[in-house]
A protein has these predicted regions:
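Poly-acidic low-complexity segments
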Residues: 2, 50-51, 83, 120-123
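RNA substrate-binding interface of SAM-dependent RNA methyltransferases
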Residues: 1-75
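Active-site/ligand-binding-proximal alpha/beta "capping" segment
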Residues: 68-117
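Structured adenosyl-cofactor binding patch, chiefly the S-adenosyl-L-methionine
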Residues: 9-13, 24-41, 101-139
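Short glycine-rich loop/turn motifs that provide flexible caps or phosphate-binding loops at active sites
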Residues: 3-4, 20, 37, 92, ...
Length: 139
């Protein structure tokens, strides 16, 4: 359900595409399609296959994208301070394990949603909604 939610949220906040990597849920599964409320067919969903790292390098080097790693890390830049300088891509990791160190190392910036109290994480779709809302409003 997270994949469908992320696609729906991305479409709602004006993303131009959703890129998936190896190990991602199938964005065209019946469940993801249902949760996306049809947005999977309105927003390009690009499956990068087995080499997401190469795709990310291509986005940065050939298309001047600024890559943002979204992390649970107090040392990362707080989301409210993040301002993209142009085209950007937000990377969301697996809900349990987060982004791999390889993908994080390819990113230009590391950003986080500051958490309070005993709450240490959010559902990946909820977090994606917060990040995408912020980026939609600072562009």
């Amino acid at each position: 359900e997270n994949m469908g939610s992320i696609i729906r949220i991305a479409a709602g906040f004006g993303a131009t595409a959703v890129l998936t990597g190896q190990g991602s849920c199938d964005p065209f599964s019946r469940r993801a399609l249902r949760v996306s409320m049809g947005n999977t067919f309105c927003l390009p969903v690009i499956e990068s296959g087995t080499d997401l790292a190469a795709t990310l390098r291509q986005l940065r080097e050939q298309h001047s994208f600024e890559l943002f790693a979204t992390l649970l890390d107090e040392s990362a830049e707080p989301l409210h301070q993040a301002r993209p300088s142009g085209n950007c891509a937000l990377l969301f990791g697996h809900e349990d394990s987060g982004l791999t160190s390889e993908w994080t190392s390819l990113c230009d910036r590391r950003i986080t949603i500051p958490m309070h109290g005993d709450t240490d994480s959010l559902n990946v779709a909820v977090a994606a909604g917060i990040f995408l809302h912020h980026f939609a409003n600072v562009r």
